[in-house]
Amino acid sequence: MKHVYITAKLVLAAWLIAPLTLLADEGMWQPHQLPAMADELKAKGLEIDAESISRLTEFPMNAVISLGGCTASFVSAQGLVVTNHHCAYGSILHNSTPEKNLLKDGFLANTFDEELPASPGSRVYVTEAVTEVTKKVVTGLDALKGNAFYQAIEQNEKALIADCESGGGYRCQVYSFHGGLEYYLIKQLEIRDVRLVYNPAGSIGKYGGDIDNWMWPRHTGDFSFYRAYVAKNGSPADFSEDNIPYQPKSFLKVSAKGVSEGDFVMVTGYPGRTNRYRTANEVENQFEWAYPEGKQLRERLMEIIEETAIEGSDERIKYEGLLAGLANYAKNFTSMIEFYGKSPMLAERQDREQQLTNWINQNKQRKQRYGETLSVLDGLIVQSQQHKERNLIVGYMRYTSMLPTARRLYRLANENLLEDMVREPGYQERDMIRFKSGMERIDRRYAASVDRAMLFEMIQRYANLPGEERIPAFDHAFNIGTTLDEVALNAVLDSMYANTQLDDLDTRLAWMTKSVGEFKASQDPFIKIAVAMYDTDMASEKKDKALSGQFMKVRPQYMQAIIAFNRDQGKPVYADANSSLRVAFGHVKGYSPQDGLRAQPFTRLEGILAKDTGNDPFDSPAEQLELIKQKQYGDFYLEAIDSVPVNFLSTLDTTGGNSGSPTLNGRAELVGLLFDGVYESIIGDWGYDPKTNRSIQVDSRYMLWVMKYLDKADRLLDEMELVYE
């Protein structure tokens, strides 16, 4: 099957001819698409020029930044960065001890000198350019198949990245859009000195905890502040006391006036992943197998952490971040399963595919071009699911530390034998600072007792797989026979954790430069397993890449058919989220979660009082409760609700990765921080529903209220530019 591509202009045309009224509030749009939407956006409430949102080096887009997994924004001329509390979680935990628990008590630096280094590997990424490179990635590769095609694409991407990063100080990446139909090279300034400036107490920043997670009404102060630092000449640099605050080209003003019900809002950020063009087979497997299995595994790992690490202990502090992440997606998967069961999603996907097939067969040229696409794609999907049980269990072993660390280090030793451009992504010279940071982070995220318990659980599950699904090298490494001898396994693990030296940072860093021969001679038990598993790992990876190469040939054909079909149907087309910069538009609006109930778009300070029990996670600081009782609203009062708004709902189309995204009004002033979605909208990753799709934002007025009246963060309030009109 011939590999095809279309240019950005053709994709743009695919939705341009659709009536703009169909766009509603759905869509995560690429910045270059926005000028064509100018009239509709103006009618919705956008007051700035839509063209300016497409120019990444100008306000407001150059004030919006990525943290590598979360979004954030500059809010002062001195590199002050605001994001979610849960996005700064790792840095808060990194600087916490049982004696000085910043997660519990909060933290405020009163001077620049008091600002704390963020967790190792923390970065601020400022997107400066997005360039379409489809031809440079895929031209001349039609004759290649499978692994050869995958490797050729990868090499072309590496060459583009190397050229992009040649000037230093930048991190570049090639992103695939529409399943490989388009490729874009994204260039980002990489700021490496990031410091924690302020986070409210956990009883504000994580108020409601896992109980309120994904729920409405919500009363969470999910905000924290970083600062970006650079060398005195303005270039990115590693942490140094001589570094100075970065001066961004622009920053966002923070609105103290906020928004009201019905107001226009937009969000800019880096949404992680959506699946709105996946096939019926993929939907069925994900909802009827992957989500239920993943939910159960995550809940079991949570139990292990809670059973093994006593609350308040140093071990527990180290695992709070992982615990929060596991809980977050366990609840996410629960919602996915629940609302899939209530929805006609599978039938709708099957119907869409039948309509697509009928449309293709109505035209000889279409049939010649796309006739086999869906059946070939479905065949690859079935093939990719053949070892799903084993792959899931082995994949969840990544939540342990020692075994994955040993395997990464030995892989590095092997990759170091190759020329840099031939090495696997993640093991090139450009990746070594990140690699080292990963080794450094382990110290504050690892406890042997917890790691051992999680690995024991995963090996137990692995041992219950059918014999044909087992991996001989893995069985041999852990002395697993036809049946599992748990007593023997316990003895093996006890010995491994007692005798490894990979729990020492200096040892891990030293292994980064050692030879393959030194690894083979090592007596460290985890390194011995990494060496024993290596050939099997590489053979498995080669098969996976060959299959991925086949997908990379077929998926673009499928997406081209979908785009052409949607164009004929008068439907807009936007790419699934892929962690690249996007813009979404919507309004402040409540919703009806179920028959007979109407959720208002704002929550109030008084809702905190009503929820508070004095016990975690509903244990607001006593001073905060007293301020609320006194109706100390100050400058942040909203007459329509007779209080200070805490959180608000919007129709913005967002997903994971948007956390920390600035929610802006029509003048591009910050009116909130996006931090969650309602429980009913989690399934929106697979399809937008205007009736229930709601994002949850921290209201800027609540953030400012906490800063001014509770935490006395006057230095930061004076530094930011607040707008009261």
Language model features by range: what are they?
Residues K9-P19:
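Bacterial N-terminal signal peptides
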